Amino acid sequence: MDFSVQQADRETSARLGRLSTAHGEIDTPAFIPVGSLGSVKGVDPADLEQLGFRLVLNNAYHLYLRPGHKVVAEMGGLHRFTGWPGAILTDSGGFQIFSLAKLCKVTDEGVSFQSHLDGSTHFITPETAIEIEEALGADIMMAFDHCVAFPAEREVVRDAVRRTTLWAQRCQASRRRTDQALFGIVQGGLDADLRLTSARDLIGLGFEGYAVGGLSVGESKAEMYAMLDVTVPELPASKPRYLMGVGMPEDLIEGAARGIDLFDCVVPSRHGRTGSLFTSVGRVVIKQARYVRDEQPIDPACGCPVCARYSRAYLHHLFQVKEMLSSRLNTIHNLWYFADLMGQVRSAIAQGRLRSFREEFYRSCVRTSLDASAVDVAEVDLHRHAPDGTSRMLKKEVG
């Protein structure tokens, strides 16, 4: 894997980059669709290619349980097994173990837990996590980390940071393959000092990339962005920076402006299945009765194949009668929206107008968001660290 910064924004910490892997190149900032079980729900690899995606996420925890990492290896690895020709990133599964598994017990040696599927007992160490990820054969692997629940006492978070560093060292030491990149994951909760400690410890281990983990777990938008303001400037500018599990549209813009290169989230597919559709002026909740005779596409400004062919009325009908096609079409539209949004972000960075793009985004979308969190975002000052090291503020006034 190789990463290069093509252009840095003068007004924010955003940058254009290119991530090169054995399975293709990814222009950054980029959004990564999530296919935890080996597929992005509702779509196939050809759909993802046509939508412009070149990198997807699979989850090692889920694939370890079913069908098993050894089965995937016997089938030629994830690329051959899933039919996806692009790049793949595997999450180590640490977050899923702590959030899904039953009777989870953590020690410095590893984590014992019961499967959320059948109650079977398992013990995962950093060494076995790497063994699993190497068997799966993704282009990018994530180190095994300890993500604590939110909120948590400072001593609990401190211990998780210590353990994350210990496990990261063991992950590095246990690597056998040289054709896969390994990213370290910064933890630290909402404690700025612990975030810095975690980042500096991991940088000392020399990973090929660095992720910011443990966010979007219940904290406010302002708190999340404050942790990015602390953490991202500490990370090496020459390495890709990945914000894990964060993917609302405003988060992509705010994260990119702070120097994040990669994002992943289940939002496009999960919201699609529940009938929440992203548009250039906010979200459409397609189950609402107002759409029963609406001949318009989801978004007249959208260029996706769903908006080119189907009306809101038809999509409302499909959702109401629980047709499988509903989830598929909704997900395709949402994925198109996210791919297009990231394309607009990259264009704005290239043209030196990310600040004005951000402001226009809030003017068009913030008042029609389904939740109040976007309003909070618009009122948050965007701290930036310019290339010359100075700090500035980008403030959006909600009109």
Where are these regions (language model features)?
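Structural signal for hydrophobic packing residues in well-ordered secondary-structure cores
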Residues: G137, A168, Q172-R175, G206, ...
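Glycine- and acidic
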Residues: F150-P151, R158, G209-L215, M324-S327
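Glycine-rich phosphate/ribose-binding loops and adjacent secondary-structure elements
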Residues: R162-T165, S174-I298
